[in-house]
């Protein structure tokens, strides 16, 4: 049985909410891509520059299976008003770490762009 977690505006921890910034989505997309490449245990599986979606795999550990992570940047073209959404899904393993996987991306991403 798998698990999942995605950023949600109702979360009390701001790092678990979608990130809204007055930045162009292309800049956030590039910053997100660079961060994924810098994170150990993360692999960038694909980057759809038109849809502004990164598909990643976060390697699992001894008890947790690998997580499939989608990072989606939305916002209007040419206007600095963007939102970053992150979703993690795990299909196997004894432990479900999806919330921790989202935090593993969002905490350094906040430092990088805020």
Kindly give the residue locations of the regions a language model identified.
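Ser/Thr-rich, low-complexity intrinsically disordered terminal regions
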Residues: 1-114
């Amino acid at each position: 049985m798998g698990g999942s977690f995605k950023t949600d505006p109702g979360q009390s921890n701001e790092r678990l909410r979608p990130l809204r910034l007055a930045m162009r989505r292309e800049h956030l997309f590039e910053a997100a891509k660079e961060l994924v490449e810098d994170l150990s245990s993360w692999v960038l599986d694909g980057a759809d520059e038109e849809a502004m979606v990164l598909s990643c795999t976060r390697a699992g550990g001894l008890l947790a299976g690998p997580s499939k992570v989608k990072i989606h940047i939305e916002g209007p073209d040419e206007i600095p008003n963007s939102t970053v959404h992150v979703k993690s899904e795990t299909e196997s393993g004894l432990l479900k770490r999806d919330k921790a996987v989202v935090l593993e991306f969002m905490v350094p991403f906040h430092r990088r762009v805020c």
